[in-house]
Amino acid sequence: MATLREIRTRIKSVKSTQQLTKAMKMVAAAKLRRAQDRALQARPYAAKLKELLDSLSGKVDTTINPLLTPRSEVKNVLVILVTSDRGLCGAFNTNIIKMAQRLIDQDYADMSRQGRVKMICAGRRGNDFFRKRGYNVVYGYPNIFNQLDFNAAKEIVEKATELYLSGEVDKVHVIYNEFKNVVSPNLISEVFLPIAPSKKDDAGSDAARQNKLVPIVDYIYEPSPEAIINELVPKHLNTQLWRVLLESNAAEQASRMTAMDSATDNAKELLRSLSITYNRARQAAITKEILEIVGGANALEQSA
């Protein structure tokens, strides 16, 4: 059985940890409010751009823009993975990394063995994980969420489109956590390039479902749809990836707040258990001392 001193030391350690987790929960809650607002505000704009692009795609020959044209054969694939920079956010990174591994090691197993699956990792956790295991990470952004801005999304899109247009990859996937609620995010894996028109029965992400709720309008375009579509495609890609980063950031803060709340509750329960153990040990020590005193007194009486 642990000594009173050892139990006191452990109680002090747990109290210190509890203060830390409680503070982290409060910080995550404050960040979540800002991140959630940014993510939700980005959804309508991204949805409207997608609606316009779908409308235009039905009026023109999509072969005018290579980013709209599927390749006849997919020989090389690029995976854009979005994780967090920091830990202590529950299963946030674990689940999304597992999804990426399944896509690469199962769906594209043959390509992966031949080194024909490339990765762009946004976030330190995913970047470190896949680099250490020998995956073909061509670009990494390990501190992207320290100062998240639109230029970060534009840079990733530029790298992805360069690889696609040069023929180095024939398909681009994006995998990320989409903010759903405070309890759990949506794990999303979708095709980023080539840009495909939205399907009527596509369940997809919350953002995709929001897009379905927007009525399709038969627009009159000026100048020509062909000119507009070439201007709209890069804006659409930049906006969609920016939304992905915002969604992931909001989901990360929600996961961290939930994880720290759970850790604080666990620390509280552990303190209660340690207090009971300490009181029992203290009572046992006092009882032992009393017995020793009584035993000593009896011995003195007998010797007298």
Curated annotation (Swiss-Prot):
Protein's cellular compartments: Cell membrane
Stored SUPFAM superfamilies: ATP synthase (F1-ATPase), gamma subunit
InterPro entries, per the entry: ATP_synth_F1_ATPase_gsu (IPR035968), ATP_synth_F1_gsu (IPR000131), ATP_synth_F1_gsu_CS (IPR023632)
GO terms under cellular component: plasma membrane; proton-transporting ATP synthase complex
UniProt main location, coarse: membrane
Keyword Ion transport included in the entry's annotation: yes
Superkingdom field: Bacteria
Topology relative to the membrane: Peripheral membrane protein
GO molecular function terms attached to this record: ATP binding; proton-transporting ATP synthase activity, rotational mechanism
Keywords: ATP synthesis, Cell membrane, CF(1), Hydrogen ion transport, Ion transport, Membrane, Transport
Biological process annotations from GO: proton motive force-driven plasma membrane ATP synthesis
Family statement drawn from the similarity comment of this UniProt entry: Belongs to the ATPase gamma chain family.
Subunit (UniProt): F-type ATPases have 2 components, CF(1) - the catalytic core - and CF(0) - the membrane proton channel. CF(1) has five subunits: alpha(3), beta(3), gamma(1), delta(1), epsilon(1). CF(0) has three main subunits: a, b and c.
Function, in words: Produces ATP from ADP in the presence of a proton gradient across the membrane. The gamma chain is believed to be important in regulating ATPase activity and the flow of protons through the CF(0) complex.
Record-given protein name: ATP synthase gamma chain
Annotated gene: atpG
